[in-house]
Amino acid sequence: MRISYTPQQEELRRELRSYFATLMTPERREALSSVQGEYGVGNVYRETIAQMGRDGWLALGWPKEYGGQGRSAMDQLIFTDEAAIAGAPVPFLTINSVAPTIMAYGTDEQKRFFLPRIAAGDLHFSIGYSEPGAGTDLANLRTTAVRDGDDYVVNGQKMWTSLIQYADYVWLAVRTNPESSGAKKHRGISVLIVPTTAEGFSWTPVHTMAGPDTSATYYSDVRVPVANRVGEENAGWKLVTNQLNHERVALVSPAPIFGCLREVREWAQNTKDAGGTRLIDSEWVQLNLARVHAKAEVLKLINWELASSQSGPKDAGPSPADASAAKVFGTELATEAYRLLMEVLGTAATLRQNSPGALLRGRVERMHRACLILTFGGGTNEVQRDIIGMVALGLPRANR
């Protein structure tokens, strides 16, 4: 096994770093980091992504017929990591989870319409799965879609629909067979692509302590063409699980951790304690930084292994057990890593961005708050452990 970048991958990293240095101007970086809105001032989030799409980078790991460069999943991972290092926004759910599911299960017409627009950075998705009474128990969802001629009529409510303010469509799980119940309730689920401009669709913001906002979305007699159903009717559960497997891996890039580690290390090298000793020379500081570095390296290798095992975006993706294992390790590592880095910074590390005395622009504090949501976004880590036990270890299903 080669546990390093190939010469070609090193060249790609250099090319991407040069590209992002030009893309992320001081003005764009400042606008994206503003506390106004989840991803900065005005339309800078979508404009930045559209620029990456026009430049051909956003979907470089996709087949050329869909607007990509036909590169490997490893190259796509390198792009994701370099974007994170540069602070450039990437629509992970759209690019890395919804789009591969469309490639695997969508009709030719759906592929022709959605995929080139996603690759161009012009089309964004939100995920509509969780409901007030169906979060962890997703198969218990109650949002209905009733067939009426060439349309479905959708009624219901979803929770935790993130990035809805930027979305053109919602990837929506609905119940098309109300008769399914008990152990077979997952068999009555279908997936629809719902325009956010559809009559009867609305949403309200949900502000969180973690920092990133999310939303509640509402569907009141929303008419969705049958042509917008992905896969067969009542057979949407495999699409949901396929998308979630991709999502769980997309949540756990180590690049932001390495970025914060570098900033904290440099700060400790240039900051002295009350006795005049550099903080970096304290053993406990060195241990904290070393623990973060070592575990982030392990996460990087996990992602490399997952990317190397995929033949491309049309691949079925990681196994449920591998996706869940990466998600549990990566999200819990992030929480612990930012906590250890905040210990090094001291009490001022708890001050938020733009607060007087905030260290490193409040970046580590914000990342610590934001990463907490990842332990249950895409499926709670408790359920991920159940999946690992059942699929990888052959243990019986947990009683919940």
Curated annotation (Swiss-Prot):
FAD binds at residues 127-130, 136, 162, 380-382. Keywords: Cholesterol metabolism, FAD, Flavoprotein, Lipid degradation, Lipid metabolism, Oxidoreductase, Steroid metabolism, Sterol metabolism, Virulence. It is an enzyme of class 1 (oxidoreductase). Its EC number is 1.3.99.-. InterPro entries: Acyl-CoA_Oxase/DH_mid-dom, Acyl-CoA_Oxase/DH_mid-dom_sf, AcylCo_DH-like_C, AcylCo_DH/oxidase_C, AcylCoA_DH/ox_N, AcylCoA_DH/ox_N_sf, AcylCoA_DH/oxidase_NM_dom_sf, Mycobact_Acyl-CoA_DH. Binds 1 FAD per heterodimer. Changing residue 247 to A: Loss of dehydrogenase activity. It comes from the Bacteria. Induction: Induced by cholesterol and repressed by KstR. One of its GO terms (molecular function) is oxidoreductase activity, acting on the CH-CH group of donors. It catalyses: (25S)-3-oxocholest-4-en-26-oyl-CoA + A = 3-oxo-cholest-4,24-dien-26-oyl-CoA + AH2. The active site is at 247 (proton acceptor). It holds the Pfam family Acyl-CoA_dh_N. Its cofactor is FAD. Uncompetitively inhibited by high concentration of 3-OCS-CoA. Pathway: Steroid metabolism; cholesterol degradation. GO terms for biological process: cholesterol catabolic process. Involved in the first cycle of side chain dehydrogenation in the beta-oxidation of cholesterol catabolism. It contributes partly to the virulence by increasing the efficiency of beta-oxidation. Catalyzes the dehydrogenation of acyl-CoA ester side chains of (25S)-3-oxo-cholest-4-en-26-oyl-CoA (3-OCS-CoA) to yield (24E)-3-oxo-cholest-4,24-dien-26-oyl-CoA. Also able to dehydrogenate steroyl-CoA such as 3-oxo-chol-4-en-24-oyl-CoA (3-OCO-CoA) as well as 3-oxo-4-pregnene-20-carboxyl-CoA (3-OPC-CoA). It dehydrogenates only (25S)-OCS-CoA diastereomer. PANTHER family: ACYL-COA DEHYDROGENASE, ACYL-COA DEHYDROGENASE FADE29. Belongs to the acyl-CoA dehydrogenase family. Heterotetramer (dimer of heterodimers) composed of FadE26 and FadE27. This is Acyl-CoA dehydrogenase FadE26. It comes from Mycobacterium tuberculosis (strain ATCC 25618 / H37Rv). The gene is fadE26.
